[in-house]
Amino acid sequence: MSRLHDMGGRFGDGPVAPDFGQEPVFKEEWHGRALALTVASGFLRQWNLDEGRHARECLAPMDYTAFSYYEKWLAGLTDILVAKGLVTPEELSTGQAALDVSDVAQHKLTQESVAESLARGGPSERQTDETPKFALGEQVKTIPAGNRSVAGGHTRLPSYAASCSGRIVTVHPPHVFPDANAHGYGEAAETLYTVAFKAGDLWQHPENPTDEVMLDLWQSYLETP
């Protein structure tokens, strides 16, 4: 996660104003189109979920702070479409198609297949021979923040929980490892754990220090204290 993308416990962003389900799903008509474009493009099989997330993280900081939620989605989608050679900057400027992308057209999402495809989802659970390193109830400590293999790379370990102690509350089956999958290094599935952290261990002055924060963390993020 980039610093801008990883906002937990960060100062200077103002209060969070939850809507408690009162706001419409899409505040503007184009928001729904942005979601549809992103989902439909993902079915072209040119990138995976973790690559898509990393594309949004890589937006220029000035753009990321200025863009609305779905503007971030469109900007990240635009960047990855160009990076994968499916769209050119000239096509984006003119609105006129020039590239031959017939080789990926076979994967396009049709109207008839939308409901079934979305219901099927994209499960990230995998079967491996890996034996879980940690057990239920065991105390663990997270590693320092950052992707250990790719400088500035994608990771699902938030900075506010880095180098912190917690306890294992659930041991899940292996799941695709985002730190590898986002950068073309394969799925590299690892055991996934739900780890409980006391709020007082994550932040210096929490309102309720004994509250617990539950995070799903991969085995590579954890070590013995």
Q: Residue spans of the language-model regions?
A:
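N-terminal intrinsically disordered, low-complexity, charge/repeat-rich segments that act as generic
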Residues: M1-Q106
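Basic/polar N-terminal segments that are highly enriched at the extreme N-terminus
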Residues: M1, V104, L109-T110, E116, ...
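Basic/aromatic-rich interaction segments and small domains that mediate binding to polyanionic partners
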Residues: G12-T38, I80-L81, S124-L136, I143-P225
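Solvent-exposed, non-transmembrane amphipathic alpha-helical segments
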Residues: E57, P61, K72, A97-V101, ...
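Generic detector of short, locally flexible boundary/turn motifs and exposed helical patches
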Residues: R3, G42-L44, D103-K108, T131-F134, ...
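Short, structured beta-strand/loop micro-motifs enriched in basic residues and often containing a Trp
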Residues: S102-V104, E112-R126, G146-V150
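Short, Lys/Arg-enriched charge-dense amphipathic segments
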Residues: Y69-I80, L92-S93, L109-A119, H175-N181, ...
